């Protein structure tokens, strides 16, 4: 266990935040799990429910609802899930200014009360909110990370299984790029028990998997009337686990690129090693010209949103 095994989830009253907290507590990843939410009664109710579940599981995790932001002091990881959810027909981009304000407010309190923490951003539009958290916190880039590719890779893994009908638990899928319409699924870097997926599926089947992956979140919104939460919550908990256990495992995450992949000053999803210091290394994949072009489109889509904020002097810079 990490020396500081305290994790705080801001927006824990929501579905994704609740799943993150529940996963962390049930696995006993942290001794303290702090639920921060504007609806304090809801947070207290969820904390009580989770503590009883932890007792049944006989884990040592203690879940507490925060009275205010002072309760996040000493956190090793702060997860930001707070924000307005997507509704049917709403793009992630529609959420831009509303959620930027929420993330800015949260980050201001993180800087004040947990200045040594690692921030994991889950709020959409993901890559842009990661940039907002970076700018507003002033933290080094390794300590502000966006949750993206683990979720998208999990969706791709599921759709590969649907095509194959075998290999459940043995499929490893790789998705880079922004967490949105311009994500870049990479069949070349996806395998089943070490066998390249390109050897098992036809080009047409692969294209169908790619399209299903890109539309995976929207499909759930259409069916449920709200965003997914089980898979995003679990994907975030996997990141928390890697940081607390200093595992150095490789996961695709949104991180600020400063020359890697030919990109400067824009966060985007790429494979990284996650450990006690957050992002400890960025892994540069050898992309084909077509993959690089798709990745650049993803970067450009994030830059467009960042430019919208900067053109409104959102970060107070001249």
Swiss-Prot record:
Transmembrane segments: none
Function: Catalyzes the reversible oxidation of malate to oxaloacetate.
Protein name: Malate dehydrogenase
Organism, as annotated: Nitratiruptor sp. (strain SB155-2)
EC id: 1.1.1.37
Principal EC category: oxidoreductase
Keywords for the protein's UniProt record, in alphabetical order: NAD, Oxidoreductase, Tricarboxylic acid cycle
Matches recorded under PANTHER family: L-2-HYDROXYCARBOXYLATE DEHYDROGENASE (NAD(P)(+)), L-LACTATE DEHYDROGENASE
Annotated Gene3D superfamilies: Lactate dehydrogenase/glycoside hydrolase, family 4, C-terminal, NAD(P)-binding Rossmann-like Domain
NCBIfam families per record: MalateDH_bact (TIGR01763), PRK06223.1 (NF004863)
Binding site for substrate: 86, 92, 124, 155
Catalytic activity: (S)-malate + NAD(+) = oxaloacetate + NADH + H(+)
Assigned protein family: Belongs to the LDH/MDH superfamily. MDH type 3 family.
């Amino acid at each position: 266990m990490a020396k500081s095994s305290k994790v705080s989830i801001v927006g824990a009253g929501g579905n994704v935040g609740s799943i993150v907290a529940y996963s962390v507590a049930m696995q006993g990843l942290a001794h303290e799990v702090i639920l921060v939410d504007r609806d304090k009664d809801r947070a207290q109710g969820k904390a009580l429910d989770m503590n009883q579940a932890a007792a049944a599981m006989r884990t040592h995790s203690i879940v507490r609802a925060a009275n205010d932001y002072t309760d996040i002091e000493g956190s090793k990881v702060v997860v930001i899930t707070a924000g307005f959810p997507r509704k049917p027909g709403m793009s992630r981009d529609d959420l831009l200014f509303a959620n930027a304000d929420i993330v800015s407010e949260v980050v201001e309190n993180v800087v004040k009360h947990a200045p040594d923490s690692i921030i994991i951003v889950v709020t959409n539009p993901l890559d842009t909110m990661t940039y907002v958290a970076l700018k507003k916190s002033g933290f080094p880039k390794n300590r502000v990370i966006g949750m993206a590719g683990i979720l998208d890779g999990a969706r791709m893994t599921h759709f590969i299984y649907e095509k194959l009908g075998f290999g459940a638990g043995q499929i490893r899928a790789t998705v880079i790029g922004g967490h949105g319409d311009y994500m870049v699924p990479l069949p070349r870097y996806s395998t089943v028990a070490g066998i390249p997926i390109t050897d098992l599926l036809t080009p047409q089947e692969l294209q169908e998997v790619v399209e299903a992956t890109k539309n995976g979140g929207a499909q759930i919104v259409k069916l449920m009337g709200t965003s997914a939460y089980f898979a995003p919550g679990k994907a975030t908990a996997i990141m928390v686990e890697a940081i607390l256990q200093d595992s150095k495992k490789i996961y695709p995450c949104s991180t600020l690129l400063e020359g890697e992949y030919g990109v400067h000053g824009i966060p985007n999803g790429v494979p990284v090693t996650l450990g006690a210091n957050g992002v400890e290394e960025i892994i540069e994949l050898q992309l084909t010209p077509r993959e690089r072009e798709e990745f650049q489109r993803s970067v450009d889509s994030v830059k467009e949103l960042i430019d919208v904020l900067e053109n409104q002097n959102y970060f107070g810079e001249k």
